[in-house]
Amino acid sequence: MLTKRALRTTDPYRRVLSRGFSVLNRPSPNYPGHVPLTTLERGALAVGSAIGSLINPRRADLIAALGEATATPYFIYRLRDVMLSDPTGRRILRNQPSINSQTLSVEYLRSLSPNTVGRTYVDWLDREGVGPDTRAKVQYIDDKECAYVMQRYRECHDFYHAITGLPVVVEGEIALKTFEFANTLLPMTGLSMFAVMRLKPEEKERFWKLHLPWAVRNGLASKAVINVYWEEQLERDVDELRKELGIEKPVDLREIRKIMRRQKKMAEEAAKTKKRY
């Protein structure tokens, strides 16, 4: 059941209209780092960041800006309500935990058994060469609680990577974003699929044949991953958690890419040998 506080904020259109302003009378920030935007500014941010991230899918700052600009006035409120409708989601909203190197001990995670959630997470971080402190702070979402929901989504993103095994290469990111879109309906995750146009022919073929069917099937069928209290799952068996959430582990993309590179190299060497004789 939604709380009175939730009911007062459920209608995003009424809230946005009641906060109308111009660049000449910009209101005070609602939380540290908040930047209130006019409708025109938000639209410009959405278009600019969408074009920029399509040109360079590795620009995490542009992808973050696109996520915030397109999440309001409806989608982030919907995701917040998904959390409010779930006991664990409500606890997350109440406690507002953060995932970073200050709250998660990497040494502790490395000491866990190999098939635990925490060990799977830190092994994925080590393999991909990333850390838990790379997520930008939310700036452009007006509602403080909804800003936290977006921040939580960002900080949990690497856990989604870890339990699926998908790498941070563009091909892996698109596959995971497609899963996230089916599961969260955040527009930025859906728009990320346009980056398929920048993939190599063999990568495009893998996306349409392997990643897209897996992402849609699992994103729609699995439980809302935003409601997972990852900090409380670290010592659990990762296969058990996948089963509970209803997530099938996809094919090992890193291994597929490695095999393809090896086959390509062998074909090139064979061609050189044939020319020589």
Curated annotation (Swiss-Prot):
Keyword terms: Lyase, Membrane, Metal-binding, Mitochondrion, Mitochondrion inner membrane, Transit peptide, Ubiquinone biosynthesis, Zinc
EC number: 4.1.1.130
This protein's record includes keyword Metal-binding: yes
Biological or metabolic pathway of the protein: Cofactor biosynthesis; ubiquinone biosynthesis
Cofactor names: Zn(2+)
GO BP terms: ubiquinone biosynthetic process
Binding site for Zn(2+): 157-158, 161, 173
GO cellular component, as recorded: extrinsic component of mitochondrial inner membrane
Pfam families referenced in this protein's UniProt entry, alphabetically: Coq4
Subunit record text: Component of a multi-subunit COQ enzyme complex, composed of at least COQ3, COQ4, COQ5, COQ6, COQ7 and COQ9.
Function: Lyase that catalyzes the C1-decarboxylation of 4-hydroxy-3-methoxy-5-(all-trans-polyprenyl)benzoic acid into 2-methoxy-6-(all-trans-polyprenyl)phenol during ubiquinone biosynthesis.
This protein's name: Ubiquinone biosynthesis protein COQ4, mitochondrial
Species this protein is from: Ajellomyces capsulatus (strain G186AR / H82 / ATCC MYA-2454 / RMSCC 2432)
Lineage, opening ranks: Eukaryota, Fungi, Dikarya, Ascomycota, Pezizomycotina
